[in-house]
UniProtKB/Swiss-Prot annotation:
This is Transcription initiation factor TFIID subunit 3. The modification Phosphoserine is found at S310, S346. Gene3D superfamilies: Histone, subunit A (1.10.20.10). Keywords: Coiled coil, Nucleus, Phosphoprotein, Transcription, Transcription regulation. TAF3 heterodimerizes with TAF10. The 1.2 MDa TFIID complex is composed of TATA binding protein (TBP) and the 14 TBP-associated factors. One copy of each TAF1, TAF2, TAF3, TAF7, TAF8, TAF11, TAF13, two copies of each TAF4, TAF5, TAF6, TAF9, TAF10, TAF12, and three copies of TAF14. It comes from Saccharomyces cerevisiae (strain ATCC 204508 / S288c) (Baker's yeast). The keyword Transcription applies. GO terms for biological process: positive regulation of transcription by RNA polymerase II; transcription by RNA polymerase II. CDD domains: HFD_SF. One of its GO terms (cellular component) is transcription factor TFIID complex. Functions as a component of the DNA-binding general transcription factor complex TFIID. Binding of TFIID to a promoter (with or without TATA element) is the initial step in pre-initiation complex (PIC) formation. TFIID plays a key role in the regulation of gene expression by RNA polymerase II through different activities such as transcription activator interaction, core promoter recognition and selectivity, TFIIA and TFIIB interaction, chromatin modification (histone acetylation by TAF1), facilitation of DNA opening and initiation of transcription.
């Protein structure tokens, strides 16, 4: 962050540059300018402190700085040399003791150096018209080869130059060259004009081909139908009902959703591993396959029917494996547990049956 001392030092540095230019110095190193500025600031503070000390030593009632305080401070610092410091015997009584101050006054009023310094301190039109030379790699190529490249952007450069000329003429007619602040503002406006001219035009039809640009909202037919007011974002209400109503009233927004397009619907989406030829063959073979399945079912039913029928052609044989309701299905061994155990023992140890 810049402090106050750095800010004032930079302002004083501009004055030193103008003084050096008025004395005939066209250029100087930045380090030399900084040294001259530092010496000027030190000497000015020394002069101010000397004037203040002399005014305090005079013991005046109002404690104001008088002209003799400044004169004596200039003499003490050696800026003005007095004609006669002490004339004890009054040998040169007719000689004026303020002759040095009179010469200093004449130098301040009639000096050509100060006049040149004032002229140098004023802003000039050349400061606004100064342009940096840019290296042109096509300068070595003949004009008949790079004529198209040279004519590229010539119209835009001409418009920028005309705007700069109008701005400078307006500043001259309004006597704006006597004020550095007006000149700085004009310089900033010119920089903005130059910066805007260097930007490439963002024209949508002039852009190169982009994949998917035809169905995009930036396409030409969408670009011509939409107004500038439609492109501005509208503030949504905090309630969901109002937002839903606004969306329903403006179907153009929902029509731009990808899901609203036919090619993006689920029934129209096919996977990469699906074979369309197999699907077509399946559609052709579908009726034959159904008829074959029906024949298999009929043959299966006939086989089951043949198994259930009697080999002798008698209906009574069908129920040969069915038990009568009077037949007791329980074994005799279940009635007598002892005989059951004996039977099992005989079976295990090789007894009689």
């Amino acid at each position: 962050m810049t402090t106050n001392n750095d800010f004032y030092f930079a302002l004083l540095r501009i004055s030193i540059l103008q003084l050096l230019k008025a004395q005939g110095f066209d250029r100087a190193r930045p380090s030399l300018v900084d040294v001259m500025t530092d010496l000027y600031a030190k000497f000015l503070s020394l002069l101010a402190s000397e004037v203040s000390s002399i005014a305090q030593a005079r013991c005046d009632q109002d404690d104001t700085i008088a002209l003799q305080d400044i004169t004596l401070a200039l003499e003490n610092l050696g800026i003005v040399k007095p004609t006669n410091v002490l004339d004890v015997y009054d040998e040169n009584s007719e000689l004026s003791s303020s002759r040095g101050m009179e010469k200093f006054k004449d130098w301040c009023i009639y000096s050509t150096q100060l006049t040149d310094a004032r002229i140098t301190a004023l802003p000039t039109v050349e400061l606004l018209q100064s342009e940096e030379k840019e290296s042109d790699p096509l300068s070595a190529i003949p004009d008949y080869l790079n004529q198209l490249l040279q004519n590229k952007g010539a119209k835009q450069k001409l418009e920028t130059k005309n705007r700069k000329t109008e701005l400078i003429e307006d500043l001259i007619n309004n006597n704006g060259l006597d004020d550095w602040i007006k000149l700085v503002i004009a310089r900033q406006r010119i920089n903005m004009i130059e910066r805007a001219s260097k930007k490439e035009s963002q024209n949508v039809p002039a852009l190169p081909h982009i994949a998917g640009y035809k169905s995009s909202i930036l396409s030409r037919h969408h670009h011509t139908t939409i107004t500038n007011e439609d492109r501005m974002p509208s503030a949504m209400t905090p309630r969901d009902e109002d937002a839903l109503t606004e969306i329903q009233e403006n179907p153009f927004v929902t029509s731009k959703l990808p899901i609203m397009r036919k090619e993006n619907r689920l029934e129209n989406i096919t996977l990469s591993f699906e074979d369309e030829e197999l699907e077509s063959l399946g559609e052709v073979e579908g009726p034959n396959q159904k008829s074959q399945e029906n024949n298999n079912e009929e043959s299966f039913k006939e086989n089951n029917k043949s198994l259930t029928e009697s080999p002798h052609g008698d209906d009574r044989d069908i129920s040969m494996f069915q038990f009568d309701s009077n037949v007791d299905t329980k074994w005799a061994e279940q009635e007598d547990m002892d005989s059951t155990f004996q039977r099992r023992t005989s079976l295990d140890y090789g007894g009689y049956f």
